[in-house]
Amino acid sequence: MEKRDSVALHWRLLLLLLLLMPPPTHQGRALRHIDPIQSAQDPPAKYLSNGPGQEPVMVMTIDLTKISKPHSSFEFRTWDPEGVIFYGDTNTEDDWFLLGLRAGQLEIQLHNAWARLTVGFGPRLDDGRWHPVELKMNGDSLLLWVDGKEMLCLRQISASLADHSQRSMRIALGGLLLPTSKLRFPLVPALDGCIRRDIWLGHQAQLSASPRTSLGNCDVDLQPGLFFPPGTHAEFSLQDIPQPHADPWTFSLELGFKLVDGSGQLLALGTGTNSSWLNIHLQNQSVVLSSEAEPKVVLPLDVGLPLQLTLDRVKVVLSQGPKMEVLSMSLLRPASLWRLWSHPQGHLSLGALPGESSSASFCLSDFWVQGQRLDIDQALSRSQDIWTHSCPQRPSNDTRTSH
């Protein structure tokens, strides 16, 4: 009996040791799961987008004669499938490098005297989790690891950094230092994402807090979506979005809500001279449909159910699930409605109208027009503080103001 108890004890100790063993290593370092939530011990994460353009959030200049380690590393997270993580060059004409995302996969574009190439590789990384990335120059070769696994090895693509004819290199985060037209395959530079623990050829990036380079959405729990903080807006030309059906004339759109807070403008149809022909406002967890001086209709809002707006020749219908409110076209001067689509300044706007004071913030899971998903990158103009592919999990003081 004692022998059986002793054997059982040994097995339990062996099992405990196995459970306590460190995980497999990559080049002597333990691989670790990166939690998507920033901990108090981590350095502040940097938001990678400066708005809809290609301007980087920061630019570093590194002296190549003082590099001790040809090695860079960082962690990033995003729900955005396309954009620039970082760009580097010694000159914009014939020696530049880009690491970004396209369709959620990493993509390298490289242009120099030794090689000109574009390569996409690895799994999709637009999953909202932190992913560690490492790059190392080894002579004329570039090696890249993601999540502790070697993903890419490119040989004979460059001179070694020690033999480089140029003495300095620029590294830009979240943007480009050359026109997008000069890329081998153009992409949308703006990336709604965050980067942290970044070391660039032995140099740690320092980013001072400012209205344009704040922590943004890097210090909150995120979910995928399209987030409009208070006071932000996006405007689409009616000529650039899917057109109404002709016979019978109908136009429809659908908004999927994940989060709603505050009161203010949600959506408007109008022109440059009249931005309020048809309005939907958020007010006390309800949506209010109105048109100029006509009577308003109110629909209680259920977050999680799509909100649908349908227009035809005789009515405007606002519905959500089984609930429905109707504005009769006899009150709305139907000719004005049809002329919106032929007017050169006819537009559809989301969020606060320019110059309007609004406390409304909302997260959209989807935005459909005429049965087609509308991308925020199609907007004629938009506020730089819109989160294009992420939303906070819940409203908070941090997200009631812009980046």
UniProtKB/Swiss-Prot annotation:
Subunit structure: Homodimer.
Cysteine disulfide partners in this protein: 194-218, 363-391
Single GO MF annotation: steroid binding
InterPro entries for this protein: ConA-like_dom_sf (IPR013320), GAS-SHBG-PROS (IPR051145), Laminin_G (IPR001791)
Protein name: Sex hormone-binding globulin
Keyword Phosphoprotein included in the entry's annotation: no
Record-linked PANTHER family: LAMININ G-LIKE DOMAIN-CONTAINING PROTEIN, SEX HORMONE-BINDING GLOBULIN
Superkingdom of the organism of origin: Eukaryota
Subcellular location: Secreted
Signal sequence segment: 1-30
Main location: secreted
One Pfam short name: Laminin_G_1
Keywords noted in UniProt: Disulfide bond, Glycoprotein, Lipid-binding, Repeat, Secreted, Signal, Steroid-binding
One GO term describing the cellular component: extracellular region
Domain Laminin G-like: 46-218, 225-391
Glycosylation sites noted in the Swiss-Prot or TrEMBL record: 274, 284, 397
Organism: Mus musculus (Mouse)
Described purpose of this protein according to its UniProt entry: Functions as an androgen transport protein, but may also be involved in receptor mediated processes. Each dimer binds one molecule of steroid. Specific for 5-alpha-dihydrotestosterone, testosterone, and 17-beta-estradiol. Regulates the plasma metabolic clearance rate of steroid hormones by controlling their plasma concentration.
